[in-house]
């Protein structure tokens, strides 16, 4: 019985390794146009779920091969000074997240504007906006975009609005309205949210997705599916359709940047429990968040460098 059990474990591990290697090799580097002068790829790490210090996080991502980190703009002066010191020490770049949790429109807008203006003064590589709420009106929402365009012109810092559930651009149909009416709108594409919102891989909204891809300058490289914003493990073969769909969208964005000689930035953003599926009763994550994000970084680097 023990021998059979050991044989089962050994054969299962071997089979799993084979499936994993198959899933990795199925995403060989695509044929891309020669990159024009100015094209560059930067990949950032998320501190979402990390419980150590800024210095510990910076050291870990530097060793893993990241170019920098994307983190929420620290409103506390001491925390901010520590972060900026660590970035300089480890020679890492930074993108800042800004937003607000206020439900009242006027309070939300005021807090958003304050945080955005402060973050822009620090001259990050970019600012990613969790803009507004999904229940704000079109006219209210447009005020966020008008303000970000103003700050972009004043500071030169690229500012993007994320396609995120609960925010202004929570759905493809809503985002299209803003894309068509706000010429200066630039996007952080986290299309995993739209897969979840529309319960599909968006095959019935190809024109809308194409419009969004053309406005994208920054990508959150998390893979979603029709029933959730994050697959359990993108290396697992059962998620191959989801992985292929997301890479097909990202390929198009990168192809455009290569042709235009422009920069593309990525954030590997697989989240911790409970964003990652967990086991019942224990809330134990079913996969290792850090390992998945590093895997994604390595695949992106190989594919798009």
Tell me what each language-model feature is.
Residues 54, 80, 108-112, 141-145, ...:
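Aromatic/hydrophobic pocket-lining residues that form the small-molecule binding cavity
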Residues 78, 136, 228:
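Short glycine-rich, flexible loops that bind phosphorylated cofactors or substrates
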């Amino acid at each position: 019985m023990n021998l059979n059990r050991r044989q089962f474990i050994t054969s299962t591990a071997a089979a799993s390794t084979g499936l994993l290697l198959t899933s990795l090799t199925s995403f060989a580097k695509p044929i891309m146009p020669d990159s024009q002068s100015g094209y560059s790829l930067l990949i950032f790490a998320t501190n979402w779920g990390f419980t150590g210090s800024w210095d510990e996080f910076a050291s870990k991502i530097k060793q893993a091969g990241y170019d920098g980190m994307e983190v929420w703009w620290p409103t506390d002066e001491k925390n901010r000074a520590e972060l900026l010191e660590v970035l300089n020490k480890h020679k890492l770049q930074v993108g800042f997240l800004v937003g607000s949790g206020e439900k009242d429109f006027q309070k939300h807008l005021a807090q958003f504007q304050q945080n955005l203006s402060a973050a822009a003064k620090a001259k990050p590589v970019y600012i990613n906006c969790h803009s507004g709420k999904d229940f704000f009106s079109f006219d209210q929402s447009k005020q966020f975009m008008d303000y970000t365009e103003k700050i972009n012109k004043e500071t030169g810092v690229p500012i993007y609005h994320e396609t995120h559930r609960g925010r202004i651009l929570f759905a493809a149909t809503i985002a299209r309205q803003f894309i068509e009416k706000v010429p200066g709108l630039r996007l952080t594409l986290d299309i995993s949210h739209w897969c979840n919102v529309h319960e599909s891989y968006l095959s019935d909204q190809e024109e809308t997705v194409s419009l969004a891809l053309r406005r994208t300058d920054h990508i959150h490289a998390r893979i979603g599916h029709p029933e959730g914003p994050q697959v359990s493990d993108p290396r697992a073969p059962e998620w191959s359709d989801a992985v292929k769909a997301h890479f097909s969208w990202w390929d198009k964005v990168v192809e455009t940047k290569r042709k235009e000689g422009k920069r593309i930035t990525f954030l590997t953003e697989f989240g911790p429990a409970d964003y990652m599926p967990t086991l019942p009763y224990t809330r134990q994550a079913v996969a290792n968040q850090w390992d998945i994000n590093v895997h994604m970084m390595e695949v992106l680097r190989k594919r798009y460098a």
